[in-house]
Amino acid sequence: MNSIEFPLLDRTTQISVISTTSNDLSNWSRLSSLWPLLYGTSCCFIEFASLIGSRFDFDRYGLVPRSSPRQADLILTAGTVTMKMAPSLVRLYEQMPEPKYVIAMGACTITGGMFSTDSYSTVRGVDKLIPVDVYLPGCPPKPEAVIDAITKLRKKISREIYEDRIRSQPGKRCFTTNHKFNIERTTHTGNYDQELLYQSPSTSKIPPETFFKYKRSVSSNELVN
């Protein structure tokens, strides 16, 4: 899985020398020992938990899960991110030391998913909060897809230059875009009093005369059914 190509050594000579740069050596050490911070909020994180078992064994990639952002260089977000959780996620990312990377796992993390439809509290894409290096679509993604995302991140690390990455980091990021709440016309079915069921928000109690009027309009057979 290591994408860095090493030169072949001459076995005929007793002394062999490998020439490289400090940047390549740093990239090789970082891609071989990624320490992820697991930020799972929904069902996608269960698929990532499968990698810990012996079937996939993600330890062979040098991944060591950490519980502190100050000891992690990779944060893996999985699940829905709400507006109330957004400041906490940004704070965790800011506490991670440089260089740091982000993998967005699942449709809810990348676009908000089905929970972002006419929702005022769901962030439509975690990339509006923190910069994302690898997008992993799926609902939920399979463990094999998670391994492929980690492999792509390792290849990206092997080709990057640290100084260029620092300069390319955005200075400010917004929390989210303005959400559009579309009020659709509801479809009512059945025989019931609309005034009883759909009252104004200021009405906290049902008047007794309205309640008994509705009760008399419904027969006993309908109440049993």
Curated annotation (Swiss-Prot):
Residues that hold [4Fe-4S] cluster according to the record: C43, C44, C108, C139
Membrane-topology annotation of the record: Peripheral membrane protein
Known catalytic reactions: a plastoquinone + NADH + (n+1) H(+)(in) = a plastoquinol + NAD(+) + n H(+)(out); a plastoquinone + NADPH + (n+1) H(+)(in) = a plastoquinol + NADP(+) + n H(+)(out)
SUPFAM superfamilies attached to this UniProt entry: HydA/Nqo6-like
Protein name: NAD(P)H-quinone oxidoreductase subunit K, chloroplastic
Family: Belongs to the complex I 20 kDa subunit family.
InterPro entries per UniProt: NADH_UbQ_OxRdtase-like_20kDa (IPR006137), NADH_UQ_OxRdtase_20Kd_su (IPR006138)
Function: NDH shuttles electrons from NAD(P)H:plastoquinone, via FMN and iron-sulfur (Fe-S) centers, to quinones in the photosynthetic chain and possibly in a chloroplast respiratory chain. The immediate electron acceptor for the enzyme in this species is believed to be plastoquinone. Couples the redox reaction to proton translocation, and thus conserves the redox energy in a proton gradient.
Enzyme Commission numbers on file: 7.1.1.-
Subunit structure: NDH is composed of at least 16 different subunits, 5 of which are encoded in the nucleus.
Cofactor note: Binds 1 [4Fe-4S] cluster.
One term under GO cellular component: chloroplast thylakoid membrane
Keyword Thylakoid found: yes
